Amino acid sequence: MAVAGQLVCGGDADDAGAQIDTIDLPAVLEQPAYGFAAPEAYAWHRELLQRAGDRYDPRVRMRIEKGATLMAWEYIDLVQARQQWIARMLSDMERYDALLSPTVPIVAPLVSDVAPANGVDKAQDAARDAEFFRVNNLLLRNTSVVNLLDGCALSLPCHVPGELPVGLMVWHGALRDDTVLNVSLQIEQILQK
């Protein structure tokens, strides 16, 4: 993230009239432990899984089927916890036009490290599955915060030419799209220098 680092540490942001602060968002660590994706995906896919579950990627199917275990009262508790979490997040974010973070915290893994099981070597298949889920959780970590927030975001390419691509995520809460787009346009102009 050398280019993004220059944006934060260099004078280009100051020259553009921006002030960049490094802040802590403790509420990020307090987000509801059980996500919405599995129960909502299961609600949509459950009949398809019964009819043609073998046509699903086994890893995807396993994640979707976890949604069947959530009880209605747990889902309602989850919705309420999310609303409280959003309020805490917005309280911490309200004085900022937008927030900046890496879109993902790592560069893309080698496909061979996370390729689906091939059934030849059970130990290797298990290791690849474990690595897939570890990497997948990392790749979803930062964007999931914005999703749970019901926020808006975009990712600006900010890598040095010739290096693996990385993105700078510009984000905020719900209905802040215009501001996020305007801030992103200004950042994009700085990054293109």
Residue map of PLM features:
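Short low-complexity, flexible loop/linker segments enriched in glycine and/or proline
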Residues: E30, Y34-P39, A115-A117, M169-W171
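Short, surface-exposed loop/helix-turn segments at secondary-structure junctions
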Residues: A33, D77, A108-L140
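Gly/Ser-rich, acidic/histidine-flanked active-site/gating loops
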Residues: M1-G35, D57, T69, E74, ...
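Structural helix-boundary/capping segments
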Residues: M1-A2, Q6, I76, A87, ...
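Short glycine-/small-residue-rich Rossmann-like dinucleotide-binding loops
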Residues: V104
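Short helix-loop capping/hinge segments that flank enzyme active sites or metal/cofactor-binding pockets
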Residues: F36-L90, S155-P165
